[in-house]
């Protein structure tokens, strides 16, 4: 895969950072560029963390010149985007919190920068800063203002995790014992999962609220998070390492047409998200808009309807593309547990009721299809869209202008011009186009025994809505060549889960934006094995003797019967890189293979069918697992390359033949994991979590869910312990114990 120029968190000049959708009222406001320097620093730090100075540099990006300018700029801009204005007293409180962080951070960094200092004092300053962040972080999770909160909360979490990494790497010079360092490692790993869960709780509340209001505002909020929130949550995981690459491949969506409200989260998860994604591992080659209009006896046009968009991917006219399942053949047995669609033809079809009594247009309708083909250029990707519609008085007229780049696809058929509504993002191109149903219930046909594929249908035709999906330029190489081309000049490659060559039956698209990718692959029950293959090619001049490791991001909420295996295949040559029978874990886990060379795998620059294959055999009926991404990194040699700086201790990794077993075998007094059966008692305004078996007992009106069997029952503002049997009874400040069966009863401040 080539190193494309756009990377949300790349160390490049500021002009290449995406600012906003440049239509009349930009959906992403330019002031959020304030977040870019933070991202720029993190991208650099992942390659080489500045020992003892990483936190100081990160703090200087969030609070430049020891001022609150960046955080205040982000807050004001997000308030404008979401039309959420914090109360004056809340703003004053947040400003006071910023100033407190600035003060303590300056005290700490100034002290440890001295040529001579007392380790015990340095340790005290470090703990004061860490504890203040833990204590005050709930101030940035504001019930009722989750949309404004999430961007501020994300930056404060980033600051804390950066501080913890500094402590892990430099703690021995700051008075920390080996046991103290283990405790910091434990805290870091716990808080990566905890902060991710809390962040997704804020996102889910706001996104669900906006979906119920209208889809346009929901997608606007989603775009903001895709640019300025989710890449940071991905950075939290990657802060464990040195020599990795942080890359955002999330799409941005623009909605044009009549507002659609009342959308449920299950509608988004089950069908709408998949519809917007189009063929997930394909790119758009041309777009066909099927529209209709009718005339009265005088030939006056009364109404024009966009009935559907027929995108064609990679020039293929036959139904292709994977939206819920990768096979055209029918299942070998009935399977109705998934509220997922398995296969959708490229052409979005709107079916009338059986008796045709609910047709939206009269019999004298003219139907036409207008087609836009790919521009004949050296870079055959649509970059801009000019799409707008006009509603005329008394509900008599609808009109459309649709233009991709310089090609007019649909001219308005109503009197008068329609103003330009240019859609464009710096560093993005158009990969998918969808027509979106308006106030129409989504239905599925679950007769798996009689249909060769499961078709998404609508109960009646619908009109007036188009959604354009923009993908970042760093995905162009794959979509242009359908393979990942590796170059010797790059030290790391990020391969999103959805950029596969093939995928097995009973595999579904899952929306997981916190991974900074367009979804993950969810593998469900099968006796044949679940598999995703990723095609790779080596560019001329590639050094096949260079040693690499493969980092695989996955989540398995139940024990996998035979584990996940990683193989490389070329002309029948298979090599097992590793396998991990994993105990159930509700959070994302990185599996890191042993180092290997492409010579070891039998792959050369002449290879034409080389694959990374991720699979699990014999998954039982109740089991499923998720694949997010692959990261190929150069092994650590001569003080350069990939290495794990924050291990998943106290988990012990014991080597067995061709297999890694992950076990919790330790005499330490703490556990890290944020696993099933987590229970927290509180009454405050939002819940975290996002997945099955979420149990919430609370007086608030929403539920998110993110981890299995998460239970929250609360009457207080927040709690800071995150291990089993943690008990905290306090009316003040913050607590610092993080071990099992920890019990603290205090009314004091610190």
Swiss-Prot record:
Entry keyword Nucleus: no
One BP annotation, GO: symbiont-mediated killing of host cell
Pfam families per UniProt: Endotoxin_N (PF03945)
Top-rank taxon, per record: Bacteria
InterPro entries listed in its UniProt record: Pest_crys, Pest_crys_dom_I, Pest_crys_N_sf
Keywords (A to Z) from UniProt: Sporulation, Toxin, Virulence
Role: Promotes colloidosmotic lysis by binding to the midgut epithelial cells of mosquito larvae such as Aedes aegypti, Anopheles albimanus and Culex quinquefasciatus.
Matches recorded under PANTHER family: ENDOTOXIN_N DOMAIN-CONTAINING PROTEIN-RELATED, PESTICIDAL CRYSTAL PROTEIN N-TERMINAL DOMAIN-CONTAINING PROTEIN
Protein name stated in the entry: Pesticidal crystal protein Cry11Bb
Encoding gene (name): cry11Bb
């Amino acid at each position: 895969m080539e190193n494309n120029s756009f990377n949300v968190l790349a160390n490049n000049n500021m002009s290449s950072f995406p600012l906003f959708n440049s239509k009349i009222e930009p959906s992403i406001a330019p002031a959020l560029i304030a977040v870019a320097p933070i991202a720029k620093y993190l991208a650099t730090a992942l390659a080489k963390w500045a020992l003892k100075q990483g936190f100081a540099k990160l703090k200087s990006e969030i609070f430049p010149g020891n001022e609150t300018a960046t955080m205040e700029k982000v807050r004001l801009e997000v308030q404008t985007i979401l039309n959420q204005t914090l109360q004056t007293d809340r703003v004053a409180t947040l400003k006071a919190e910023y100033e407190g962080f600035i003060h303590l951070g300056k005290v700490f960094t100034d002290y440890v920068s001295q040529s001579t200092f007392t380790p015990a004092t340095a340790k005290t300053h470090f703990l004061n800063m860490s504890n203040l962040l833990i204590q005050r972080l709930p101030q940035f999770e504001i019930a009722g203002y989750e949309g404004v909160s999430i961007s501020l909360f994300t930056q404060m979490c980033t600051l804390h995790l950066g501080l913890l990494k500094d402590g892990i790497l430099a703690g021995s010079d700051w008075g920390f014992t080996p046991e103290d360092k283990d405790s910091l490692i434990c805290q870091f790993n716990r808080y990566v999962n905890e902060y991710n869960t809390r962040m997704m709780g804020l996102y889910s509340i706001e996104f669900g609220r906006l979906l119920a209001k209208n889809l346009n505002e929901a997608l606007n909020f989603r775009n903001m998070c895709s640019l300025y929130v989710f890449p940071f949550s991905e950075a939290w995981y990657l802060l464990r390492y040195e020599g990795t690459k942080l890359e955002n491949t999330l799409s941005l969506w623009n909605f044009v047409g009549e507002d659609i409200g009342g959308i449920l989260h299950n509608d988004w998860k089950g069908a709408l998200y998949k519809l917007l994604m189009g063929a997930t591992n394909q790119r758009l080659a041309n777009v066909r808009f099927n529209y209709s209009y009718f005339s009265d006896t005088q030939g006056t046009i009364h109404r024009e309807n966009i009935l559907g968009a027929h995108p064609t991917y990679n020039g293929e006219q036959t139904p292709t593309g994977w939206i819920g399942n990768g096979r055209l053949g029918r299942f070998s047995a009935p399977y109705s547990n998934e509220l997922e669609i398995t296969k959708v033809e490229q052409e979005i079809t709107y079916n009338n009721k059986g008796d045709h009594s609910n047709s939206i247009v009269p019999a004298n309708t003219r139907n036409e299809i207008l087609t836009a083909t790919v521009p004949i250029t050296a870079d055959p990707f649509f970059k801009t869209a000019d799409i707008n519609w006009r509603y005329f008085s008394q509900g008599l007229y609808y009109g459309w202008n649709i233009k991709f780049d310089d090609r007019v696809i649909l001219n308005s058929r109503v009197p008068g011009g329609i103003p330009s509504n240019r859609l464009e993002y710096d560093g993005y191109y158009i990969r998918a186009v969808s027509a979106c149903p308006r106030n129409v219930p989504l239905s599925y046909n679950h007769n798996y025994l009689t249909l060769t594929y499961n078709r998404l249908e609508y109960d009646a035709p619908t009109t007036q809505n188009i959604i354009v999906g923009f993908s970042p330029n760093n995905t162009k190489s794959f979509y242009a060549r359908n393979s990942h081309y590796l170059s010797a000049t790059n030290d790391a490659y990020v391969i999103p889960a959805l950029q596969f060559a093939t995928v097995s039956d009973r595999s579904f698209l899952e929306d997981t934006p916190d991974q900074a990718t367009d979804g993950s692959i969810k593998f469900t029950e099968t006796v044949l094995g679940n598999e995703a293959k990723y095609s790779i090619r080596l560019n001329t001049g590639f050094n096949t003797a260079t040693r690499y490791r493969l980092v695989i991001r996955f989540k398995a909420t139940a024990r996998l019967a035979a584990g996940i295996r990683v193989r490389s295949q070329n002309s029948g040559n298979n090599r097992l890189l590793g396998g991990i029978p994993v105990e159930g874990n509700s959070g994302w886990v990185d599996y890191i293979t042993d180092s290997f060379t492409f010579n070891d795998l039998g792959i050369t620059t002449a290879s034409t069918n080389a694959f990374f294959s991720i699979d699990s055999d014999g998954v039982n009926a109740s089991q499923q697992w998720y694949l997010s991404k692959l990261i190929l990194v150069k092994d650590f040699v001569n003080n350069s390359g990939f290495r794990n700086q924050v291990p998943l201790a106290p988990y012990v990794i014991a080597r067995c033949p061709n297999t890694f077993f992950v076990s919790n075998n330790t005499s330490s007094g703490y556990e890290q994991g944020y696993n099933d059966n987590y229970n927290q008692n509180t009454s405050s305004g939002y819940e975290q979590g996002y997945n099955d078996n979420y149990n919430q007992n609370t007086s608030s009106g929403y539920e998110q869910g993110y981890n299995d069997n998460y239970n929250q029952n609360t009457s207080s503002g927040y709690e800071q312990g995150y291990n089993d049997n943690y008990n905290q009874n306090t009316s003040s400040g913050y607590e610092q114990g993080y071990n099992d069966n920890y019990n603290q009863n205090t009314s004091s401040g610190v």
